[in-house]
Amino acid sequence: MDNPTDTAGKCPVAHGNKPRGPSNRDWWPNQLNVQILHHNSGRADPLGKDFDYAEEFKKLDLDALKKDLHALMTDSQDWWPADFGHYGGLFIRMAWHSAGTYRITDGRGGAGQGQQRFAPLNSWPDNANLDKARRLLWPIKQKYGNRISWADLLILTGNVALESMGFKTFGFAGGRADVWEPEELYWGPEGTWLGDERYSGERQLAEPLGAVQMGLIYVNPEGPNGNPDPVAAARDIRETFARMAMNDEETVALIAGGHTFGKTHGAGDPSFIGAEPEGGAIEDQGLGWKSSFGTGVGKDAITAGLEVTWSQTPTKWSNYFFENLFAYEWELTKSPAGAHQWRAKNAEASIPDAYEPGKKHVPTMLTTDLSLRFDPIYEKISRRFLENPDQFADAFARAWFKLTHRDMGPKVRYLGPEVPAEDLIWQDVIPAVDHPLVDDKDIAELKAKVLATGLTVQELVSTAWASASTFRGSDKRGGANGARIRLAPQKDWEANQPAQLAKVLGVLEGIQKDFNAAQTGAKKISLADLIVLAGAAGVEKAAAAGGNAVSVPLTPGRMDASEAQTDAHSFAPLEPRIDGFRNYVNGKRLQFMKPEEALVDRAQLLTLTGPEMTVLVGGLRVLKAGNPEHGVFTSRPETLTNDFFVNLLDVATQWVPATGKEGVYEGRDRKTGAAKWTGTRVDLIFGSHSQLRAFAEVYGQADAKQKFVKDFVAAWNKVMNADRFDLV
């Protein structure tokens, strides 16, 4: 894997030459950015709102496509020649780097949208010359058109590269629909490529970041900050791979497996390399990193500045990586480009040259390769793989599948004939529906039974929201399906009010048991469905109390996951530390976000628009579905009204910081000074931020009472069904 270091110090923002006035963000850099709620809204989609990628994919002749990809592997082009006559190593790196931006903290990044096509990823130093890989693929993409997305093609090509070199992959699933504009993510605080201002204390990597430097996928292959220390590098590897949801065995398998093929490129000084794609000339047509060193390609190529080939058979699956790693002692040296790398001591030249037949080189390794030998935990795993090649092959196949499919969500989203039959725990498995579902009559009766228990609107709504609002549109995890709110760790999360949650779940489980036992046939209701049903009943009751009769729909079909189907550790990153919808902040608040920023961030993960976020906050506040101390701007709590907006926007109220309470404000009567309300930054942002205030004014108007309830129910239902991919 190439990890170029040649553009350090350059600004990662591509600036145009044409003068322009400053943007709003230039004038007010601390302004809350709500535009992320409207990215990839469909207006930029050239395929139109009616295009169904899943249906198009079904028309794909996958065998024919793979045959064409196999042929491409050895169809070397003069403008970008194939190392060793085979593009396999290049395409593995392309697929790896497409998927490798995934981070478990917020589920963002990954291969699911084909973001490698866009800035900044297309111009990251770590992705140098992958523009050539995608350009090599264009004739095939052009041939198969909309039947294969770029997102799927990048991963499939990596699989075919492995298969063409003798490796048996675990499988492939299609279903990654392309997007048409770059995702606006927080990739770090740095303003220069390869900057590393993301650390504090004893090399504590800031959240939610998953790489050690700006523009890298994981780690610096020369070692931390270029220090060639394999043990120190192992610490960086362990941290960054863990943030991609990989354990130690998967980490070793991925590094060794990927480095069984191909080579890195450091034929000359990085100063010979030109601008990245986004900074290139218009005539370069999106190709960057043009090199003036020699021919600039093939034997003269410069990508990472490192010049390493790991295996005696770099176009064939083998165990040479581990054999070489343990067969030699290693001495520090430098590549022709001046980068730190390692050379085997007293070794014969056994590594083939990529372009000169018969020429051999001494085995070489990266600092991060040696980490697999000198870190004591990695070393044990590596020796086991050395002695058991079949275990290594299986571990790499599974880890590669996880790497390339981690952000796709549940298996119901997988498409194609190569989907593995085996269920894997990281897929957050949910049992298939195996019984008749409740009908409208049952739903009405169950709602009545729920309300007859005496559970309050607040308890019903809070529980349903806690269950569903874990959903992340980024990696399609979380949500109400599976009823994992009753399992560890979710049942113990502070934001979920564990004591109240246990009470509500106990009552609902009793209703579920009685209903299922009373059926003469096989009809059942899952607890997952019943939790959502109970929340709907609570919303209906609250709306009726405000004079609006509404029916909150329920589409049954959720099932209950078991503890055995749940990796509790992997759900820890889904725990809310700041949840603006519930006005919740705990002691482990996110240091890189203000509460209002965390609200927008959570809304984006829930795939909500600005108006949807606004109406949900207003409704949840008056229903007391969260922190009851602040933001409940109503004299009739648990009644679904637009009171939150009416009272927030009341010009007779003056807001002042509360004494001794950071982030809390008091709303006082302008004339008397009497305290009326207390609110948080999240509450007040809807009166302070000009765009959010515009949304709030719509819902605070005298004629908005019915619209508010209608829009709240629609947004509520969207969140309740966010993970129902079976309905799409």
From Swiss-Prot:
Binds 1 heme b (iron(II)-protoporphyrin IX) group per dimer. InterPro entries: Catalase_peroxidase, Haem_peroxidase, Haem_peroxidase_sf, Peroxidases_AS, Peroxidases_heam-ligand_BS. It holds the Pfam family peroxidase. Its cofactor is heme b. It comes from the Bacteria. There is a cross-link at Y218-M244 (Tryptophyl-tyrosyl-methioninium (Tyr-Met) (with W-96)). One of its GO terms (cellular component) is cytosol. PROSITE patterns: PEROXIDASE_1, PEROXIDASE_2, PEROXIDASE_4. Heme b binds at H259. There is a cross-link at W96-Y218 (Tryptophyl-tyrosyl-methioninium (Trp-Tyr) (with M-244)). Its EC number is 1.11.1.21. It catalyses: H2O2 + AH2 = A + 2 H2O; 2 H2O2 = O2 + 2 H2O. Keywords: Heme, Hydrogen peroxide, Iron, Metal-binding, Oxidoreductase, Peroxidase, Plasmid. It is an enzyme of class 1 (oxidoreductase). The keyword Nucleotide-binding does not apply. GO terms for biological process: cellular response to hydrogen peroxide; hydrogen peroxide catabolic process. Formation of the three residue Trp-Tyr-Met cross-link is important for the catalase, but not the peroxidase activity of the enzyme. Homodimer or homotetramer. Belongs to the peroxidase family. Peroxidase/catalase subfamily. Bifunctional enzyme with both catalase and broad-spectrum peroxidase activity. Important for stationary phase survival. HAMAP family: Catal_peroxid. NCBIfam families: cat_per_HPI, PRK15061.1. This is Catalase-peroxidase. It comes from Rhizobium etli (strain ATCC 51251 / DSM 11541 / JCM 21823 / NBRC 15573 / CFN 42).
